[in-house]
Amino acid sequence: MKLGVNIDHVAVLREARAVNDPQIIHAMFEAVSGGADQITIHLREDRRHINEDDVKNIINLSPIPVNLECSINSEIIDIVCELKPHRATIVPEKREELTTEGGLSLDSLNLKNVISKLNDNDIKVSLFINPKKNDVIMSKELGATCVELHTGAYANTFLMLNSNLNHTKYKIDNLNLKRGELEILLNSELTRIKEAANISTNLGLEVAAGHGLNYQNVTAISSIKDIFELNIGQSIVAKSVFVGLKNAVKEMMELVK
């Protein structure tokens, strides 16, 4: 199992004061020192954290592959084609969201053209999708070589079942259920991910997973044999506040491997 470390939240901290501290390149090298297999970053249309200079510097200096998350916005795709990361993961994007809220809608008329353009520029293409059979099949038909399964529903259910989240202002209202119901739902979400991963592998797609994964919930996902890579960010950066980024990555690597 490989670990992609998303360092977007280091850039979020930098932008909180609009100064060049902490430096994103320093974060990249700390993640590498901790054993990361890949650096993941998201160049959003609103540039709320990562910007073009960050992307260029990380791609040029990273000793490990760079996975660049992006929307299908034409300006963004042109930047991706120019900078040529190892992989481009196409994600849905809404300006009002705090983070990516769900998998891609695969019925966009422009999506196939974007995938073709990225392939023509020798960039591996992954689609960030919900763990559904039809989405996996469509991803293959559209020309993707990889899918990243959205683990947000699993992660949210796990949190509501196994933490005090329900007693905070961050509780998830639609998951305000009895423990027995949450346990059934958690098993259902895990089964959905396993089945989607298996279908993907059978179709010849590489399978990654991510969103909301942390030190408590990652083991069940990392044990799925059809998944070859996990992309994890916020929980690692949060842990790094107390133990340092290198050590935070090391701890996650121990769980993932």
Swiss-Prot record:
EC number annotated for this UniProt entry: 2.6.99.2
SUPFAM superfamilies, sorted: Pyridoxine 5'-phosphate synthase
Site (Transition state stabilizer) residue list: E148
Keywords from the UniProt entry: Cytoplasm, Pyridoxine biosynthesis, Transferase
Residues bound to 1-deoxy-D-xylulose 5-phosphate: D8, H9, R44, H49, T99
Biological process, per Gene Ontology: pyridoxine biosynthetic process
Signal sequence, renumbered to the chain: none
Active site residues of this protein: H42, E69, H211
Claim: Transferase is one of the keywords in the record: yes
GO terms of molecular function: pyridoxine 5'-phosphate synthase activity
Associated pathway: Cofactor biosynthesis; pyridoxine 5'-phosphate biosynthesis; pyridoxine 5'-phosphate from D-erythrose 4-phosphate: step 5/5
Predominant cellular place of this UniProt entry's protein: cytoplasm
Keyword Coiled coil: no
Positions that bind 3-amino-2-oxopropyl phosphate: N6, R17, G212, G233, Q234
Subcellular location: Cytoplasm
Reactions mediated catalytically: 3-amino-2-oxopropyl phosphate + 1-deoxy-D-xylulose 5-phosphate = pyridoxine 5'-phosphate + phosphate + 2 H2O + H(+)
Family listed: Belongs to the PNP synthase family.
NCBIfam families given in the database record: pdxJ, PRK05265.1-3, PRK05265.1-5
Subunit structure: Homooctamer; tetramer of dimers.
Function: Catalyzes the complicated ring closure reaction between the two acyclic compounds 1-deoxy-D-xylulose-5-phosphate (DXP) and 3-amino-2-oxopropyl phosphate (1-amino-acetone-3-phosphate or AAP) to form pyridoxine 5'-phosphate (PNP) and inorganic phosphate.
Protein name: Pyridoxine 5'-phosphate synthase
Gene assigned in the entry: pdxJ
